[in-house]
Regions:
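Cell-envelope/extracellular polymer assembly enzymes that use nucleotide-activated donors
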Residues: 6-9, 39
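Short, well-formed alpha-helical segments that are part of the catalytic scaffolds
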Residues: 17-31
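A conserved acidic beta->alpha catalytic loop
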Residues: 41-53
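Glycine-rich, basic loop-to-helix element that forms the pyrophosphate-binding segment
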Residues: 67-83
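Short aromatic/hydrophobic "clamp" motif used to bind/position activated sugar donors
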Residues: 88
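Conserved donor NDP-sugar-binding/catalytic core segment of glycosyltransferases
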Residues: 96-133
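Conserved nucleotide-sugar donor-binding catalytic segment
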Residues: 135-213
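C-terminal subregions of glycosyltransferases and related glycan-biosynthesis enzymes
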Residues: 178, 185, 191-313
């Protein structure tokens, strides 16, 4: 790379999951983009020798692997610190980039390298007519994002915003929020809603209590912004409602239905009561168990049709 600063750094924090990271890397390098324009930085807090060997075998000059000792999700901060690109974009280690997505990200950098807004990438979930959504202030930014602000993989920032990052308050559950809320006192802010990746199988995801993480910790972060006057009460309420709907869906899938992931699901009523109260918890449970028979019946019908289709083939 002749010591030139790449336009784009793709940051991949992981806990040694070679079975996910390798397909992600393949989806990156199969696009054939000029390696001088971007770099890929992996930080692995499990220090998996299999992943290290797989990365070494790929022998790409712009691919960097760093074992780290940071606990849990704070590995995300390590990934950004190891980057040297003008623009740093986090990737979920379970993602696979879509064809042409690196070119899309490089174009994004070129469009905004002068203005340098704080950018968050929502991967098409907002379904807006325009992919580039300007936000005048943090309140507008948070209101448009809602619960998606909790999604670390959408995080992106300019290299210059990384100065003194360790002096900022870093939340151990949502460390990416330091980049969204604390590296700058004001905008400009931009949401990019381009669709650039898909997720691989998440059957083994989990390992934490989502009712504590989202229902308490994430809303604590929103409450701080409200108390500081950086977001308005209606924005906080919008995010609170978003989180409730998310937790209701998660409760339905992880508690009511038989299919389970590895989440910790203890003390749900107590955790829900912090920002919602026992009444909302009871409404959630009643709703989910009233819907369950219909969903289970629909699943059974889908399985029967799938079985018949296989037999026809």
């Amino acid at each position: 790379m002749e010591n030139k600063v790449p336009l784009l750094s793709l940051c991949i924090p992981t806990n040694g999951r070679a079975e996910w990271v390798v397909p992600l890397l393949e989806s990156i390098y199969s696009q054939g983009e000029d390696p001088a324009l971007f770099e890929v930085v992996i930080t692995d807090n499990a220090a998996n020798p299999d992943l290290a060997s797989a990365v070494s075998a790929m022998a790409h000059p712009n691919l960097k692997y760093f074992p780290t000792k940071s606990a849990g999700f704070t590995n995300q901060v390590d990934a950004f610190e190891k980057c040297s690109g003008l623009f740093c974009k986090m990737l979920n280690h379970r993602s696979v980039l879509l064809p042409g997505s690196i070119r899309m990200l490089l174009s994004l950098v070129e469009r905004y390298r002068t203005e340098k807004p704080l950018i968050y990438c929502t991967n098409g979930v907002l379904k807006t007519k325009e992919e580039d959504i300007d936000c005048a202030d943090l309140d507008t930014f948070v209101k448009r994002l809602g619960i998606y602000a909790s999604w670390s993989a959408g995080t992106a920032l300019w290299r210059e915003d990384l100065q003194d990052i360790r002096s900022k308050p870093i939340n151990s559950t949502f460390p990416h929020t330091v980049f969204l809320f604390d590296v700058r006192e004001q905008g400009p802010y931009l949401i990019w809603d381009g669709h650039y990746h898909e997720l691989q199988n998440d059957a083994t995801s989990g390992g934490y209590n989502p009712f504590e993480a989202f229902g308490i910790t994430f809303l604590d972060l929103m409450s701080r912004l409200l108390k500081e006057g950086r977001i308005q009460p209606d924005t906080f309420e919008k995010v609170r409602k978003d989180v409730f709907l998310f937790l209701r869906t998660l409760h339905f899938k992880e508690v009511v239905l038989p299919a389970k992931h590895g989440y910790i699901l203890t003390d749900i009523p107590e955790k829900m009561s912090v920002y919602y109260g026992r009444r909302d918890y009871r409404i959630m449970v009643l709703y989910n168990y009233s819907v369950a028979p219909f969903e289970l019946g629909a699943n059974k019908v889908r399985k029967i049709f799938a079985s018949l289709k296989r037999k026809v083939k």
